[in-house]
């Protein structure tokens, strides 16, 4: 019975061994006669020590309490009693080694390699805890979930790259197909167009018969006009004589006006500003309402203006438009035809001009700008009349007793506006007029005694570029010849008649288009300038593009690229030093940190996840604060039992993990006995700062956990060490402490020194 009772008693003790209270180093059977307790074989008390109670107190050195306490504290840190143990090297006894040898396994080859492979070294650093400094090694603990997530992300990126590559290849293929299709369609369109052109049959031209019909029709018209002009005026014959010449379209060419005429016009305008009577007279003459006496008086003003010197200030010569043939015929041929026709068609019944017409002839081509009141301007189309139009206008003026119709005010407004741009247009306009200037014979000058010689500067500039002008004009003639239609002679004659009638109707519309003419002339000048500039630039080489008065093209701004900053060797070394390995990049967030003491490499501990981490200024040092629960053994037993109850009725996927469960929120949990610890980690490279900072729980979660411990538990009170002992009453304790220090010193001495001591 005694044996059974003994067995039951031992079994009961084993079952209750897990729930035994921890003494936390307090020695059993302390001597109540002494004023202190023995904790870890060191004299401690809750109250401050009272050394005056000793009869024969020993010194601090002889008592050996201070040095023993430092040694005990360092051993406590190295054993990691405040950290959670993760891995420890296992030692096998002789029986286990013999069994492994029988199985053919070398016991020395078995090391906890599987556990070691799960830990990847991060760096070496220093830990400062209390008065101690420990060199430690930091490790990253491998996590299967992190590895799986990394591999999935890597595969997803790889799939995205493949999809993107396929899309790019497909886009390239489609682009190539579209390009080939466009090319094919273009070729088909060209082939169809060629076939259509081949199918077209060109109508054969009958130049001799058509021209004969046209000449016959024009000759009949000319005879009719000559008969009508014989009764009214001899000037009418010019229209019929030039009708043969006016076969083809005319184009306007700008030429400079005579210098004396421009000076006279400017002086007249200047006099009209100061003399109101002259201004009114100019308005009457321009409107065709002046009498013969007023015209005679106006002639005196003209003579006076001619005698005056040029006005002071800067002014530039004006240009006038002269119509020339647009086809390959030269002006010389046109003038010869006019002269021959005039000699043939002159009749003895030519009537002399009246005095009013003679006066109008002398005053014609004088263009003045009187100071008109608003709303009384004479409108014009901004285009000076040609030679035939001016002759026709003179004849109609004589019939209507209105001698002067060519004083066009809107034309003068145009000339004032064009003075600004004439300098730049001069070179291009001269380029267009060079052919007509060279081919005009002396007979034309005899036929037109009223025309004055051109300006000397204009003639010189025209003489500089004969070859270029001829090349340009020949190209234009070719274009005009290619643009001729293949219509019949009747349609050609009708178009000529229509063009002549449109030219005459233009003069009649001058009085109703004053404001529009000013704007249109401005636009026309600018467009003409652009056309002439493009023609000159296309014909000339790049070096000869700039001419007198022509504005140079704006210089293209040069694009500058910023130079990439050249990195020094130090910066390159810093960049290399800041680079992380692939494994370290995986665990840049949520890593589990493990460390080992260099003094005790057989054991590795986990850094507590419920810690508050603070990075210091140097970015290589950190303050780590956490709470140590001294009765964590009792709390751990309660946690495992409680999790079993909670997960019993749940699926495996819904099980609560230990790291997600806070036992201190349960009222049945044992009250924690805790103390706070703060340590310092130094010497951690900057590149690992993200890994270190993100390896702990968020600060809000840690604060809630610590608050639950502080609210439920009680802080462990500190003990006060007695650094002095009594020589007689504490003789054995002091001797034991001194012997322990002596033995600890012997471990640092060599074998030779040990033999000498022995």
UniProtKB/Swiss-Prot annotation:
GO CC annotations, alphabetized: Swr1 complex
GO molecular function terms listed in the Swiss-Prot or TrEMBL record: ATP-dependent H2AZ histone chaperone activity
Pfam families: Swc3
Ranges in a coiled coil: 151-233
Bias kind Polar residues: ranges: 388-427
Subcellular location: Nucleus
Compositional bias ranges of the Basic and acidic residues kind: 153-174, 186-198, 213-227, 336-345, 444-487, 526-549
Segments of skewed composition (Basic residues): 1-10, 175-185, 199-212, 235-253, 555-565
Stretch list, region Disordered: 1-34, 153-253, 323-577
Keyword check for Repeat: no
Calcium in keyword set: no
Main location: nucleus
Record InterPro entries: Swc3
Keywords tagged on the record: Activator, Chromatin regulator, Coiled coil, Nucleus, Transcription, Transcription regulation
Domain of life: Eukaryota
Biased composition (Low complexity): 351-360
Listed Acidic residues bias regions: 323-335, 488-509
Family: Belongs to the SWC3 family.
Quaternary structure (record): Component of the SWR1 chromatin remodeling complex.
Function, as annotated: Component of the SWR1 complex which mediates the ATP-dependent exchange of histone H2A for the H2A variant HZT1 leading to transcriptional regulation of selected genes by chromatin remodeling. Involved in chromosome stability.
Protein name: SWR1-complex protein 3
């Amino acid at each position: 019975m005694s044996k059974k009772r003994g067995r039951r008693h031992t079994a009961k003790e084993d079952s209750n061994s897990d729930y035994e209270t921890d003494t936390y180093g307090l020695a059993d059977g302390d001597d109540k006669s002494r004023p202190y307790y023995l904790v870890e074989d060191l004299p401690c008390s809750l109250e401050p020590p009272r050394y005056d109670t000793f009869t024969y107190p020993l010194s601090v050195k002889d008592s050996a309490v201070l040095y023993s306490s430092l040694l005990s504290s360092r051993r406590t840190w190295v054993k990691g009693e405040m950290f959670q143990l993760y891995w420890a090297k296992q030692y096998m006894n002789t029986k286990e080694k013999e069994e492994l040898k029988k199985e053919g396994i070398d016991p020395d080859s078995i090391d906890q390699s599987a556990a070691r492979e799960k830990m990847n070294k991060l760096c070496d650093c220093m830990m400062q805890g209390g008065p101690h400094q420990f060199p430690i090694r930091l490790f990253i603990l491998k996590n299967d979930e992190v590895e799986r997530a990394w591999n999935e992300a890597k595969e997803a990126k790889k799939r995205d790259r493949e999809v993107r590559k396929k899309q790019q290849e497909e886009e390239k293929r489609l682009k190539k197909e579209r390009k080939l299709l466009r090319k094919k369609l273009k070729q088909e369109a060209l082939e169809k167009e060629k076939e259509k052109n081949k199918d077209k049959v060109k109508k054969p031209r009958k130049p001799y018969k058509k021209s004969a019909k046209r000449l016959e029709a024009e000759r009949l018209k000319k005879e009719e006009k000559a008969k009508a002009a014989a009764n009214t005026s001899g000037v009418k014959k010019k229209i019929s004589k030039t009708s043969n010449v006016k076969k083809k379209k005319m184009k306007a060419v700008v030429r400079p006006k005579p210098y004396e005429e421009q000076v006279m016009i400017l002086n007249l305008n200047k006099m009209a500003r100061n003399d109101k009577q002259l201004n009114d007279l100019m308005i009457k003459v321009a409107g065709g309402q002046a009498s013969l006496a007023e015209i005679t008086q106006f002639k005196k003003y003209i003579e006076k203006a001619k005698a005056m010197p040029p006005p002071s200030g800067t002014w530039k010569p004006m240009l006038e438009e002269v119509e020339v043939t647009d086809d390959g015929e030269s002006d010389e041929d046109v003038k010869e035809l006019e002269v021959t026709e005039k000699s043939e068609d002159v009749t003895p019944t030519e009537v002399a001009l009246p005095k009013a017409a003679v006066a109008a002839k002398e005053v014609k081509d004088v263009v003045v700008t009187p100071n008109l009141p608003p709303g009384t301007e004479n409108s014009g189309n901004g285009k000076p009349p040609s030679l035939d139009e001016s002759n026709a206008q003179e004849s109609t003026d004589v019939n209507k007793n209105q001698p002067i119709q060519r004083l066009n005010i809107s034309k003068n407004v145009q000339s004032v506006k064009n003075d600004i741009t004439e300098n730049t247009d001069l070179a291009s306009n001269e380029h267009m007029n060079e052919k007509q200037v060279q081919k005009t014979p002396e007979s034309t000058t005899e036929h037109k005694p009223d025309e004055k010689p051109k300006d000397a500067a204009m003639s010189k500039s025209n003489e500089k570029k004969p070859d270029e002008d001829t090349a340009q004009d020949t190209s234009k003639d070719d274009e005009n010849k290619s643009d001729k239609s293949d219509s019949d002679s009747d349609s050609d004659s009708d178009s000529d008649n229509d063009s002549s009638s449109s030219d005459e109707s233009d003069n009649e519309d001058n009085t109703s288009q004053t404001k529009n003419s000013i704007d249109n002339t401005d636009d026309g000048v600018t467009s003409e300038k652009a056309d002439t500039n493009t023609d000159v630039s296309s014909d000339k080489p790049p070096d000869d593009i700039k001419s007198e008065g022509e504005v140079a093209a704006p210089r293209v701004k040069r694009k500058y690229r910023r130079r990439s900053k050249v990195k020094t060797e130090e910066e390159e070394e810093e960049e290399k030093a800041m680079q992380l390995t692939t494994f370290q990049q995986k665990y840049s967030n949520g890593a589990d940190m493990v460390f080992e003491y260099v003094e005790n490499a057989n054991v590795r501990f986990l850094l507590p996840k419920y810690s508050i981490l603070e990075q210091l200024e140097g970015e290589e040092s950190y303050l780590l604060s956490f709470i140590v629960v001294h009765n964590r053994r009792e709390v751990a037993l309660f946690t495992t039992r409680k999790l079993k109850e909670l997960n019993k009725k749940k699926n495996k996927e819904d099980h609560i993990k230990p790291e997600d469960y806070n036992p201190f929120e349960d009222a049945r949990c044992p009250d924690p006995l805790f103390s706070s610890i703060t340590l310092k980690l130094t010497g951690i490279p900057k590149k690992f700062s993200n890994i270190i900072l993100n390896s702990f729980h968020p600060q809000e979660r840690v604060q809630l956990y610590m608050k639950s411990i502080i609210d439920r538990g009680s802080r462990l009170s500190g003990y006060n060490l007695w650094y002095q002992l009594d020589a007689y009453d504490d003789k054995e304790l002091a001797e034991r402490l001194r012997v322990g220090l002596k033995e600890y010193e012997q471990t640092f001495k060599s074998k030779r020194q040990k033999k000498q001591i022995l």
